UniProtKB/Swiss-Prot annotation:
GO terms for cellular component: cytoplasm. The gene is avaA7. GO terms for molecular function: aldehyde dehydrogenase (NAD+) activity. Transmembrane segments: none annotated. Signal peptide: none annotated. This is 3-diazoavenalumate denitrifying reductase. The keyword Transcription regulation does not apply. Oxidoreductase involved in the biosynthesis of avenalumic acid (AVA). Catalyzes the denitrification of 3-diazoavenalumic acid (3-DAA) to produce AVA. It can also act on 3-diazocoumaric acid (3-DCA). Can use NADPH or NADH as a reductant, with a preference for NADPH.
Amino acid sequence: MRVLVAGATGVIGHPLVGALRARGHNVSALVRDASRAPEADRVVVADALDREAVLSAVSAARPEVVVHQLTALRLLRDDPPEAFAQTARLRTEGTAHLVEAARAAGARRLVAQSIAFAAAPQGPPVLDEDAPLYVDAPDPGWAATVRAVAELERLVASSDLAGLVLRYGTLYGPGTGYARDGGTALRVLAGKLPLPEGGAGVTSFLHVDDAVGAAVAAVESEATGCLHVTDDEPAPAAQWLPHYARTLGAPPPRTLPAALAPRLLGWFMTHQLTTARGAANDRARTALGWKPTHPSWRDGLGRE
């Protein structure tokens, strides 16, 4: 098939281009900077926030399937607010441009990335895809992020393309914040990520390789809707954070009184470590015939 990968320089998009080509697909890489493009059958250049540029680039590629892997999370270590603000625009404006361009170019299918950790913290510790999103989060930044996620998912569902949203778990592996040289790892190594009392917030992790594998399966499937793409072992912070510190060779995380956590860690990290819900991957396994090659974070988190 002719496949266009938007966001082809990212931690998932870059290896995804190669994985799709290895499966025999003809792959166009949509990038902002041609010098950073992976090896592809065609490279098309456009800023995803420039409607006319996107329409032109996608038209030139003539894809049957468009894969949306656009984020600005490369900015996360240096400028987190800007990274989240730009990613929100890519999820709203960028998605709208891709949907319009895909339709105009005659594509039949759209696969878009989302996140599996945007659910409201209510109900059981591990939730399925029907759980409500946390659009009314008390933190303005996180509420804006989740509203952008909701808009992306709405745009994909309301298009007349066969649309599938892959809600990725918290990514680890090369190029992520949880890599040994990533921002989260450096914070843990410096003893600057304490564990709030209880540590009951649940995280569903996902190795980058498994995100790529799920995206390939999604391109080749006819599944539609939203799917959680996560590993098999959702874990409370009280389990994964000490394990991660040991694997990195860092000191054990100190315990932090719950009342101090928001002031010292910020709202989002406190939410992740204390109240966040995990995500069940049963539907993705069934709909895509996919399963993680890294079924547990215990086997890889902090090792690469």
